[in-house]
A protein has these predicted regions:
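N-terminal pre-P-loop "Q-motif" helix
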Residues: 6-33
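Alpha-helical scaffold elements adjacent to nucleotide-binding pockets in ATP/GTP-utilizing enzyme cores
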Residues: 15-20, 50-54, 75-86, 123, ...
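Conserved Walker A/P-loop ATP-binding site and its immediately adjacent core
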Residues: 50, 62-92, 129
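Conserved H-loop
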Residues: 44, 70-71, 200
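Inter-Walker segment of RecA-like/P-loop motor cores
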Residues: 90-135
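Short helix/loop segment immediately N-terminal to the Walker
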Residues: 26-39, 136, 141-143
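Signature of the SF2 helicase/ATPase Hel1-core->accessory helical subdomain module
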Residues: 56, 81, 127-207
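Walker A/P-loop
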Residues: 30-54
């Protein structure tokens, strides 16, 4: 109901939502582990729409803080347009978002330290910037404490890039210096953190 009214869900998008909701609500499926999903969707199939729908669903489930990160800055900017710019033809949310009788605003934040618990708070970053912010803490940037103190939904687009360093087997790169280490560190900082990974190019033989 809170997606843009010009958006018409395709059958496979409805299936994706239903599959996630089933997984989210079934402890037997995620076996008492943190929720971590990978959605394999082709380019142009509406990945960002699924992200928007899951943000709304998880807000209703008690989540307020969302980190979107990707390998390339231009994708960050395109996603901001989809999520934040109400004047854009590609804006994905309804003009007014109402959840459980309350009007909900979407806000872009730099960190999660002083977020409004009534809003959808989204921090946009690149994988490189996330790694740098955690390695070299600075004022107003993300810190590991953000992920320890509040439950965060991590949304990773083209997540296979996160694993690049590890999969190439570059032994000379210390694990502590890799992007993958930083992502796993923030994901596991709080047991309630959720990881939603999206990719168009998953190697199903070696996922």
């Amino acid at each position: 109901d809170n997606l843009n009214n010009r958006v018409e869900l395709r059958d496979y998008q409805i299936d994706a939502f239903q599959n996630f909701i089933t997984y989210y609500n079934s402890e037997g499926l995620h076996k008492n582990k943190q929720i971590h999903t990978l959605l394999h969707m082709a380019t142009g199939s509406g990945k960002t729409l699924i992200m928007a729908g899951l943000i709304l669903y998880l807000y209703k489930s008690g989540y307020r803080n969302f980190l979107f990160f990707v390998n390339m800055t231009n994708i960050v900017e395109k996603t901001k347009e989809n999520f934040m710019n109400r004047l854009s033809s590609k804006y994905l949310f309804a003009e007014t978002i109402e959840i459980d009788g309350d009007i909900v605003d979407i806000r872009e934040v730099d960190n999660f330290q002083n977020t409004n618990e009534n809003d959808i708070n989204i921090c946009f970053s690149t994988t490189q910037k996330l790694h740098f912010d955690l390695s070299v803490p600075q004022e107003n940037s993300l810190t590991i404490e953000d992920f320890e103190d509040k439950k965060i939904v991590l949304i990773s687009d083209e997540s296979h890039h996160v694993n690049t360093l590890t999969k190439k087997g570059k032994d000379d790169i210390a694990e502590e210096q890799s992007w993958e280490y930083s992502v796993n560190r923030v994901f596991t900082a709080n047991r309630d953190n959720i990881m939603l990974e999206f990719t168009a190019t998953c190697d199903l033989k070696d996922p």
